[in-house]
């Protein structure tokens, strides 16, 4: 059975960025696991106006576990870091933990944020770079194992994907006032369209994505804003950048075609 490992920062990241893709690949027989670095205790409180950060973290953990069941995610691991403080970690701490988790899971694909963190969130960006470092070590380890057994199986090397928002989509959503033009003190630009290597059609899985998002009751404001445009053709797709295939960095060439699968 093939495996995908998602690595994100907060509960709901999995549903906003990859819910349709997860549902699609689970239906195709893949196992999907998720690592969440924090419990999102500094997020919106929504209906839970009296919740302390600790209580909100408990609520959001349960919301994520419920969403994971809707999507068919097999295992959810929380790393227990504090929301909003990932960039303050000593270099190597998060990276080493993620490497051990990736090595334990032995995934065919690892998916995390792109280098913009999609929304410029510092936690997202930290998770992106930490996961990339961990994946590089993992890919080298896999390469060593394949060499030891004399395997020449083409395509056996794992892949690292960045989930992203295309620059064109970000501009469109800003024009509609669906997202702000600035986020975390910087323009919300998204990733250059020319960097995107895979566009997954998730139109058949919009209802599953909706149900997963609706599990995140505490984040009702963001969920409602997203779902208000959920039937738009641009949001019937999820977008990815293939960053590494094994130990090889991947760049989109001018003659390369965008794939419709991971």
Where are these regions (language model features)?
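Metal-dependent de-N-acetylase/amidase catalytic core
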Residues: 2-3, 91-262
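Active-site rim/loop-helix segments in enzyme catalytic domains that contact anionic ligands
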Residues: 1-105, 133, 137-140, 247-251
């Amino acid at each position: 059975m093939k495996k995908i490992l998602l690595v994100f920062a907060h509960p709901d990241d999995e549903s906003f960025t990859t819910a349709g893709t997860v549902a699609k690949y689970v239906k195709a027989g893949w196992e999907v696991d998720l690592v969440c670095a924090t419990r999102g205790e500094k997020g919106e409180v929504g209906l839970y106006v009296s919740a302390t950060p600790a209580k909100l973290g408990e609520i959001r953990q349960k919301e994520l576990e419920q969403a994971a069941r809707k999507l068919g995610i097999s295992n959810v691991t929380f790393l227990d870091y504090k929301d909003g403080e990932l960039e303050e970690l000593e270099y190597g701490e998060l990276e080493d933990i993620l490497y051990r988790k990736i090595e334990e899971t032995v995934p065919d694909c690892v998916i995390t944020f792109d280098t913009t963190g999609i929304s410029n969130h510092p936690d997202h960006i930290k998770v992106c770079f930490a996961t990339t470092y961990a994946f590089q070590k993992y890919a080298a380890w896999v390469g060593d194992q394949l060499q030891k057994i004399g395997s020449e199986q083409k395509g056996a090397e794992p892949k690292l994907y960045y989930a992203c928002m295309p620059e064109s989509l970000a501009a469109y959503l800003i024009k509609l006032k669906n997202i702000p033009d600035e986020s975390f003190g910087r323009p919300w630009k998204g990733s250059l369209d020319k960097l995107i290597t895979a566009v997954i059609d998730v139109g058949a899985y919009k209802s599953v994505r909706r149900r997963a998002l609706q599990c995140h009751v505490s984040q009702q404001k963001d969920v409602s804003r997203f779902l208000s445009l959920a039937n738009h053709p641009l949001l019937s797709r999820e977008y990815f950048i293939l960053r590494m295939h094994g130990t090889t960095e991947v760049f989109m060439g001018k003659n390369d075609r965008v794939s419709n699968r991971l």
